Amino acid sequence: MTNFSESEISEFKASFNQFDENGDGQISALELQKILTKCGEKVTGVEVRDMIKEVDTDGNGSIDFKEFLQVMQKARQHSANASPAFASAVKKVGAVNTIGGYSGSTASGVQHSYSDEEKVAYIDWINNCLAKDVDLKSRLPIPEDGDKFFAACNDGLLLCKLINDAVPDTIDERVLNKKNLNAFRINENQVLCINSAKAIGCNVVNIGAGDLVEGRAHLIMGLTWQIIKIGLFARINLTNHPELYRLLHDGETIEDLLKLPVEEILLRWFNYHLAAAGSQRRVKNFSGDIKDSECYTILLKQIAPKDAGVETSALNISNLDQRAVKVLENADKLGCKKFLKPKDIVTGFQKLNLAFVANLFNTHPALEPVEDVVIIEETREEKTFRNWMNSLGVDPFVNNLYEGTYDGLILIQLFDKIYPGLVDHKKVNYPPYKAMGAEMKKIENCNYAIQLGKDCKYSLVGIDGKNVYDKNKTLTLSILWQLMRGHVISILTALSGSGKPIADADIVNWTNSKLSAAGKKQISGFKDSTISTGIPILDVIEAVRPGSVDPALVATSGSAEDNLLNAKLAVSTARKVGAVVFALPEDIVEVKPKMVLTLFASLWQVEMTK
């Protein structure tokens, strides 16, 4: 028996789930090796099996949660040298800098982790990105030492500004509380920050406004990284860079490139330039393969303008620390000395090296333009669904809607998150798949996803798993819309306590009850043309949370420009009062009934949770 508290067990369960990628309740050798590799730890298959064997009490070749807890108990009782190797691996995945006190510990005293290297990198990035922001001039630049960064995040203003830097116009800054900041107004900013982060695809399931106000370091670090990463990755796609077509391998199509996560695209881009420079070296990761600085030296020389003064003298230096210094000197000549210190290169700090390379691509892609390549741009609806899915923490992160869902696994994950207990994991085919039969396994997953939808009374007439596998856009969007609606309705139903599912008509009736009580004109439904002005939404927000809408900001001319301003105001104000809104201002102006439904439903949730 272990003597951990309930809170500690909950924390360990979260760690366990980080390893247990397929959710089968066991950590396999493959899963352990995969996550250690992601964290920059080079381990062989034999080493991984030995780690597991050391703690696998029932001898089945994997680690269940009970065994996991026993390992952590041993680690607590022994010194680091005497702890099982697996326990050390868990700590490495967690991070390297444990912090105590209110900023990083739970009430039970469980310590959380973050690395000073990350903190310094994020601070430098923020200081540069937001240097000209007049609202932040009193707190920038943020010093790198101590907890000053977390204190700077206290009132929500800094992270809201960072979100707008990553994805411009996410937040209507007219709604930010910038002056006379009491506890209530600070909390409003933090609620706006969290709901806006969700809207751009951040997974903030376990973060509340109070965590940010209290300066809980590990949570602020995690959110900051997600925001920065989304901003760095936002333009690394075929829509913004059709010249990425040049990264295709022989026999591949554009579809093959769309399947790749951004990390893989960046590795291809890196290797493309290594090959163009005549180097035989190739990188397969952002950790071990870049430690000696050789590949960085070649890459920087290859992508640099000829007059930038970038050179390759680092290759003549045997000392790796000095080589890394040279790399960053060259990066500085390109205006790209971001995220890394020399030791981050030498130690192969995966996360920061990934950010460094992404920033290099964004500033100096150095790819020749291509002609006659048809690029289908992501629609607003597709992006909204993608951000919603990612905000729920689906794994892997969805970069392309149809490539990300065609094997059925993400859809099944969504059903599992929206309707806990619905999914029978024994019916799910998890990768890796054998070459023979892989297609059938994926189609079986898609068929199971469709069956789950039917079990939830979704309208799926004429849709089967093969449609999803074939990336039929119309049918895939139909399923995703019903999942999004199901998510909103399931929360509403739970809050109502009636056990009776909330219908669309109920949401219209509630909306009109709010408008009527406020003496405002009612709507005929979610297609009502008056919604295009944004005013009915602002009226409902004001009815739910009196005083939240500044009447001086509401435009009444009915012009397209004023309507859009009102829509932006409505979306950000709704998020500020606690609504999780994925609808965009354009959805309001164009009166997209599906998105309008979710917005009013989210406002009803706010009223129920008062």
From Swiss-Prot:
The Calponin-homology (CH) domain sits at: 116-232, 260-365, 379-488, 501-608
Query: Which InterPro entries does the protein's record reference?
Result: Actinin_actin-bd_CS, CH_dom, CH_dom_sf, EF-hand-dom_pair, EF_Hand_1_Ca_BS, EF_hand_dom, Fimbrin/Plastin
User: What are the boundaries of the region Actin-binding 1?
Assistant: 102-365
Note down the stretches annotated as region Actin-binding 2.
366-608
> Any idea which positions bind Ca(2+) 2?
56, 58, 60, 62, 67
Q: Name one GO molecular function term.
A: calcium ion binding
Per UniProt, Ca(2+) 1 binds at 20, 22, 24, 26, 31
Keyword line: Actin-binding, Calcium, Metal-binding, Repeat
Q: Report the CDD domains cross-referenced here.
A: CH_PLS_rpt2, CH_PLS_rpt3, CH_PLS_rpt4, EFh
Q: Which GO terms describe its biological process?
A: actin filament bundle assembly; actin filament network formation; sexual reproduction
All residue ranges annotated as the EF-hand domain in the record: 7-42, 43-78
Disulphide-bridged cysteine pairs = none
Question: Which PROSITE patterns does UniProt cross-reference here?
Answer: ACTININ_1, ACTININ_2, CH, EF_HAND_1, EF_HAND_2
What GO terms fall under cellular component here?
Answer: actin filament; actin filament bundle; cell leading edge; cytoplasm; lamellipodium; phagocytic cup; phagocytic vesicle
Q: What domain of life does the native source organism fall in?
A: Eukaryota
Asked whether the UniProt record includes Cytoplasm among its keywords, one would answer: no
Report the protein's function.
Answer: Binds to actin.
- The name under which this protein is listed is Fimbrin
Q: Which organism is it from?
A: Dictyostelium discoideum (Social amoeba)
Name the gene that codes for it: fimA
